[in-house]
Regions:
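Conserved active-site segments centered on acidic
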Residues: 5-44
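Ser/Thr/Gly-rich flexible loops in soluble cytosolic domains mediating phosphotransfer, phosphorylation
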Residues: 6, 78-110
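Short, surface-exposed alpha-helical segments at coil->helix boundaries
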Residues: 18-22, 64-71
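Short, well-ordered alpha-helices that flank and scaffold nucleotide-derived cofactor binding pockets
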Residues: 22-30, 72, 99, 103
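Short acidic active-site motifs
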Residues: 44-48, 66
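Short acidic/histidine-rich motifs immediately flanking catalytic phosphotransfer sites
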Residues: 51-56
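Short secondary-structure boundary segments
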Residues: 60-62
């Protein structure tokens, strides 16, 4: 069995982000993508990424101000980092959010 690749969403507290995770995971499952999508508070980012290899980090709009700092920390490790577009987040559009993550992953591999 193929191991699942991990995508992490980081936010302030995690309530609305867990809804987005569920929507993104449903789209991934629907398309047979071997992905595991999880949400954590941004304060735990270093700890979570250190213990679990991730292929992509997305920040929720509430913590988007930390985007550059997060990129500076994790992109040198080969982990692409992006922010979820506030409009996509507001609509809780799991498909568009997942597409954004996949674009980030592809751009990192070039």
């Amino acid at each position: 069995m193929m191991s699942k690749k991990k995508i992490y969403l980081f936010c302030d507290a995690g309530m609305s982000t867990s809804i987005m995770v569920n929507k993104m995971q449903a789209v991934a499952n629907e398309h047979g993508m071997p992905l595991e999508i999880s949400a954590y508070p941004v304060a735990r980012a270093a700890e979570v990424v250190e213990t679990e290899k991730t292929i992509c980090i997305l920040l929720g709009p509430q913590v988007r101000f930390l985007l550059q700092k997060t990129k500076d920390k994790f992109e040198p490790l080969g982990i692409p980092v992006g922010g979820i577009d506030p409009e996509i987040y507001g609509m809780m559009d799991g498909e568009k959010a997942l597409k954004e993550a996949l674009k980030l992953i592809k751009s990192q591999k070039k």
